[in-house]
Amino acid sequence: MFNVVIVRYGEIGTKSRQTRRWFENILMNNIREALVSEGIDFKKVEAKHGRVLVRTNRAREATEVLTRVFGIVSLSPAMEVDAELEKINKTALKLFRKKKRELNLEKPKFRVTARRITKEFPLKSPEIQAKVGEYILENEESEVNLHEYDIEVGVELMEGKAYIFVDKIRAWGGLPIGTQGKVVALLSGGIDSPVAAFLMMKRGVEVIPVHIYMGEKTLEKVRKIWNQLKKYHYGGKAELIVVKPQNREEMLKKIKELGKEKYTCVLCKFMMVKHADRIAKEFGAKGIVMGDSLGQVASQTLENMYIVSQASDLPIYRPLIGLDKEEIVDIAKKIGTFELSTLPEDEIPFIPKHPVIRGSWEEFRKIYMAIFGEEPRKRDC
């Protein structure tokens, strides 16, 4: 029934004409990539008057996939017809009846919303709304209600065509991936780090996922998490990078001998950031993403995050810093990573009973020198 998907974007529309065209082109490329990767045939993807039109006979399936493409605010599977009142009326009635059956309503309340994006059509928007609404009332048991409606019939007109729809499906918004550069995201296998990576993707950033190896069970879990996140990563090309640290056992043995086991978590995170820093520079990434939420665990106090941040001179982004655990879990459930994050994983045998809560850089520096025989790096800014 539907032959086109109307794609609406948000922030892109606030850009200058030249910048907007660049964003639109990246968005359209990401749309094409998403459809091809999901095996959905389409005839054309084009930008017109602040909209992107996806011409496909599988509009419902395409809409479901495209809700996961960042930069899109909402979508509508629609029927494109010539901008003639009779054709508009008949198509609107057809879609109204279909929606009425789906909702299983005998006398639905409805309204018609029309917009002339270009002005060739002789009737003004309120007149179109009145004509289409009148036609539906004459031919179908229904009631007009502009505020408390069951069905909204949308009509958009541009360049001699009318696009009629009855659904407006919300997407994630944000910016198209590929418009804001690259970052390395540390993925531990927990609930938080996938959400942090997701939120950076949402802002148009290509993510390079890095996992610091803890065991096969955890690695398998992280692979599943990344495969789920890739469903939102259209426009990004990176695959999971696994780092197997050398001499970790020796490092942990030495910190125990020093009687400074309370710094174990801070030291391990410091070393993780060092690995991420190396990979980020290798790939030309402009920062490192971590799933820290302020005060959630001992290693995520301001003092301890300050120490960990010294391991790289790149910016360290913590998009969850102001979120409660419940808010993070809610996002994880929506994006499909929560259940995966709660799968069994390898036990971590070296977590101290009493981890340091407010670590000191000077004390950490002495521990680091005693273990590695050199000064830890300290960021320049």
From Swiss-Prot:
Which is one GO molecular function term here? Answer: tRNA binding
SMART domains reported for this sequence: THUMP (SM00981)
Write out the pathway annotation from the protein's UniProt entry: Cofactor biosynthesis; thiamine diphosphate biosynthesis
Name the domain of life this protein comes from.
Archaea
Q: Where in the cell is it found?
A: Cytoplasm
- Reactions catalysed, as given in the entry: [ThiI sulfur-carrier protein]-S-sulfanyl-L-cysteine + a uridine in tRNA + 2 reduced [2Fe-2S]-[ferredoxin] + ATP + H(+) = [ThiI sulfur-carrier protein]-L-cysteine + a 4-thiouridine in tRNA + 2 oxidized [2Fe-2S]-[ferredoxin] + AMP + diphosphate; [ThiS sulfur-carrier protein]-C-terminal Gly-Gly-AMP + S-sulfanyl-L-cysteinyl-[cysteine desulfurase] + AH2 = [ThiS sulfur-carrier protein]-C-terminal-Gly-aminoethanethioate + L-cysteinyl-[cysteine desulfurase] + A + AMP + 2 H(+)
Q: Name one GO biological process term.
A: thiamine biosynthetic process
Gene Ontology CC: cytosol
- Residues annotated for ATP binding in this entry: L186, L187, K269, G291, Q300
Against SUPFAM superfamilies, the record matches this protein to: Adenine nucleotide alpha hydrolases-like (SSF52402), THUMP domain-like (SSF143437)
CDD domains for the chain = PPase_ThiI, THUMP_ThiI
Q: Which residues form the THUMP domain?
A: 60-168
> What are the protein's UniProt keywords?
ATP-binding, Cytoplasm, Nucleotide-binding, RNA-binding, Thiamine biosynthesis, Transferase, tRNA-binding
E.C. numbers: 2.8.1.4
NCBIfam families on file: PRK08349.1 (NF006222), tRNA uracil 4-sulfurtransferase ThiI (TIGR00342)
Q: Which family does it belong to?
A: Belongs to the ThiI family.
Q: What does this protein do?
A: Catalyzes the ATP-dependent transfer of a sulfur to tRNA to produce 4-thiouridine in position 8 of tRNAs, which functions as a near-UV photosensor. Also catalyzes the transfer of sulfur to the sulfur carrier protein ThiS, forming ThiS-thiocarboxylate. This is a step in the synthesis of thiazole, in the thiamine biosynthesis pathway. The sulfur is donated as persulfide by IscS.
Official protein name in the record: Probable tRNA sulfurtransferase
Q: Which gene encodes it?
A: thiI
